[in-house]
Curated annotation (Swiss-Prot):
The protein's assembly and partners: Part of the 50S ribosomal subunit. Contacts protein L20.
Keywords noted in UniProt: Ribonucleoprotein, Ribosomal protein, RNA-binding, rRNA-binding
Single GO molecular function: structural constituent of ribosome
Described function: This protein binds to 23S rRNA in the presence of protein L20.
Annotated family: Belongs to the bacterial ribosomal protein bL21 family.
Protein's UniProt keywords contain RNA-binding: yes
A Pfam family it matches: Ribosomal_L21p
GO CC field: cytoplasm; ribonucleoprotein complex; ribosome
The keyword Glycoprotein is assigned to this record: no
GO biological process, one term: translation
This protein's name: Large ribosomal subunit protein bL21
Length: 103
C-alpha cells in the first residue's frame, strides 16, 4: 500500500517501512506523528484520489532524526564593478520512518 502525502509544501509518495527526509518538523526524536494531509491512497489494484484530500486517510510516521543537508554555495558577481559576494546555505531536514497507512 502507498500514499501521497503533503508536508512542508511538498508532496511525497510513501510506502510503509520507507525512510524519507522532509522539511524540518517541530517534533522530538522518537515521537509518533499522524499526517492527515493525504492526497492519494493506492494498493496496486485500486486508487483513491482526494479532492484535494482523501477523507479519513492518515499516515503514521516516527521521527528518526533531525539534521542539515550539504552546503549549497552561492556566488554573486557584477562584471566590471569589483563586486563579489559569497554565501552558503544548509537546509534543515527531519528524517521520518513511515508506519501505518490507513484509509
Amino acid at each position: 500500500m502507498y500514499a501521497v502525502i503533503k508536508t512542508g509544501g511538498k508532496q511525497y509518495r510513501v510506502a510503509s517501512g520507507e525512510k524519507i527526509k522532509v522539511e524540518q518538523i517541530a517534533a522530538d526524536v522518537g515521537q509518533e506523528i499522524v499526517i492527515d494531509q493525504v492526497l492519494a491512497v493506492g494498493n496496486g489494484s485500486e486508487i483513491k484520489i482526494g479532492t484535494p484530500l482523501v477523507s479519513g486517510a492518515t499516515v503514521t510516521v516516527t521521527v528518526l532524526s533531525h539534521g542539515k543537508h550539504d552546503k549549497v554555495g552561492i556566488f554573486k558577481m557584477r562584471r566590471r564593478k569589483h563586486y563579489q559576494k559569497r554565501q552558503g546555505h544548509r537546509q534543515q531536514f527531519t528524517e521520518l520512518q513511515i508506519g501505518a497507512i490507513a484509509g
